Every structure is written in C-alpha cells, then in structure tokens.
C-alpha cells in the first residue's frame, strides 16, 4: 500500500505526464525542495495551516495566485481540516474538488453554497472501494501507471533502500512519517 505522501507524488507525476500544471502544497521546506526537484510547477509551504479567518483568507489568496486562470480545475485534498475551505475557495468555475482523506485530523465542514457559486463538484475518492466496485477501470489505471513507469513518464522517488533483514526499520520509518517517497526493501 502507498502512503499518503507516495500517492501525492504518484498523482503529481501523472498530472505532469498528462501535460497539466502541478501546484503542490506541503508542510515543510524539505518537502518543497523535493517537489520542486521532481517537477512541481509551484510549491506552497503551508506550515501548520490557517488558524483564523484572516489566515484562511490569505492562504486561499496565495493558492489562487499560483493558478493560471484564477482558480483550479482540480484540487486533490488528502489533508482536510482547516485547509479544506481555503483550498475550495481557490477552485475555478466547474472545478472538481477531490476528497481523498483527512490527514490533518478533522473532517472539514464546507459551506455548501460555494459549490453553487463556483458550479463546482465535490467528489469522494476512496481507492479501496474503487478497486472492488470498478475492478476493470482500476486494472486499466494500474496498466496505465505501469506503462508510464516503463517508458519513464513517471519516476517514483526512492528515498531509501534497506536490506530485507531490516524490514522492521523500514516499517518504523514509514510509520513515523519520516520518509518522503518510497522505501525499497532489497535482498
């Protein structure tokens, strides 16, 4: 299974491979550098997130300023919490807001009138259910990713290779969120 960070890197790779622009939000400068090195067009370091309405408004304005059209066609949100509403406010007309998870902890409450004002859609993306309910489509996606990997259109970030006998160390690294990219176990 992929960690949230690994899914984000894979999505960013697929977005870039399809010719779209990737604006990425991260919590630290270290992650920002990695995203820039791996081709993100813009990177926003959001730190601990907006703490009040003014900070949320400023965060949304910063997000909008990085878009070309004054709003995004697609927002992929694995974070939720206090980041969700400012991100949704940065969506463009007829944009799609993909709800992927709630890594920041709290399930956000969005003012539903924003969907009306922006003609936007909120879409739940739950890969676990998708694999069973839409098996054939999932297989097509996996084949597409494998093809992109084989021709070098996407390149996973391998942050560390660890001998198989140290698998426990690898699991601990991933569990502590101390890894950006993939940890590969080798014989």
Where are the predicted features?
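Short loop/turn segments at beta->alpha junctions
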Residues: 80, 163-166
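Glycine-rich phosphate-binding loop and adjacent beta-alpha segment
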Residues: 18, 26-29, 35, 82-154, ...
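Single conserved hydrophobic/aromatic residue that forms the stacking wall/gate
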Residues: 1-7, 11
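C-terminal capping/lid region of NAD(P)-dependent oxidoreductase domains
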Residues: 146-147, 151-160, 168-187
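Short conserved AdoMet
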Residues: 4, 68, 92, 178-179
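Adenosine-nucleotide cofactor-binding segment
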Residues: 16-83, 137-140
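Active-site loop of short-chain dehydrogenase/reductase
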Residues: 6-7, 71, 92-97
């Amino acid at each position: 299974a992929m960690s949230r960070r690994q899914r984000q890197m894979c999505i960013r790779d697929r977005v870039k491979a399809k010719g779209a622009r990737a604006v990425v939000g991260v919590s630290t400068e270290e992650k920002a550098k990695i995203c820039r090195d791996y081709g993100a067009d813009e990177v926003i370091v959001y730190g601990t997130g907006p703490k009040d309405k003014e900070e949320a408004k400023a965060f949304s304005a910063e997000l909008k300023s990085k878009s070309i059209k004054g709003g995004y066609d697609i927002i992929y949100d694995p974070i939720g919490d206090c980041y969700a509403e400012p991100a949704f406010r940065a969506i463009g007309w007829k944009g799609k807001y993909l709800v992927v998870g709630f890594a920041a902890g709290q399930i956000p409450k969005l003012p539903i009138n924003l969907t009306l004002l922006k003609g936007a859609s909120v879409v739940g993306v739950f890969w676990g259910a998708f694999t069973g309910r839409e098996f054939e489509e999932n297989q097509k996606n996996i084949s597409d990713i494998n093809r992109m990997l084989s021709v070098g259109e996407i390149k996973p970030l391998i942050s560390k290779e660890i001998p198989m006998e140290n698998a426990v160390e690898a699991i601990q690294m991933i569990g502590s969120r101390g890894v950006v990219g993939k940890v590969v176990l080798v014989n």
